[in-house]
């Protein structure tokens, strides 16, 4: 029941083995937060694409000198989300600039992604993660993901619909074995 409450689903592979998938849609939350930041700090909607990781700021976040106050606005408050963000202290107006508030958003979204990934991973020894979608171009996200997933191999793909493509390749391979 815990998996279902956190939107982690179990599927059956073509080899009759259980495959877990944790569905997590960060894009809508990101769009919502960017819109809010753009409004507060009077920035163009594409301004965030110019932001590189601020290593000093990130270091302060990791060692607790800066508290992460991000709180998701559009993501369902599942038990996992409630564990990560027990209270809503998110107020982007208190940050000195767009960049600081943006790093808070990406910090929170990265933590959500990592928790979702680890939920799906369960006890599996897998240490290779494939990432596709719009976040592969977000350098702050990638930097934080590498830190939170130290010991994992991260592969990034620009290929659209990578999961669907991977499934299609697997089915094609299986069909070819039966036909030949």
Question: Where do the protein language model's features map onto the residues?
Answer:
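Active-site core segments that coordinate phosphate-bearing ligands/cofactors
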Residues: 1-128, 137-161, 168-180
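Glycine-rich Rossmann NAD(P)(H)-binding loop
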Residues: 131-132
């Amino acid at each position: 029941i815990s998996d279902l409450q956190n939107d982690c689903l179990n599927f059956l592979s073509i080899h009759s083995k259980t495959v877990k998938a944790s569905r997590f849609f960060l894009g809508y939350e990101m769009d919502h937060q960017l819109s809010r930041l753009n409004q507060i700090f009077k920035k163009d909607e594409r301004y965030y694409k110019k932001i590189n990781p601020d290593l000093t700021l990130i270091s302060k976040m990791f060692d607790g000198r800066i508290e992460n106050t991000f709180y998701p606005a559009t993501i369902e408050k599942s038990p996992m989300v409630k564990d990560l963000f027990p209270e809503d202290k998110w107020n982007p107006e208190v940050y000195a600039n767009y960049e600081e508030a943006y790093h808070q958003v990406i910090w929170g979204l990265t933590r959500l992604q990592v928790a979702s990934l680890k939920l799906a991973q369960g006890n599996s020894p897998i240490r290779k993660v494939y990432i596709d979608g719009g976040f592969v171009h977000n350098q702050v996200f990638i930097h934080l993901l590498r830190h939170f997933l130290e010991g994992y191999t991260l592969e990034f793909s620009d290929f659209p619909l990578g999961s669907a493509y991977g499934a299609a390749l697997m089915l094609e391979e299986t069909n070819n074995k039966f036909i030949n």
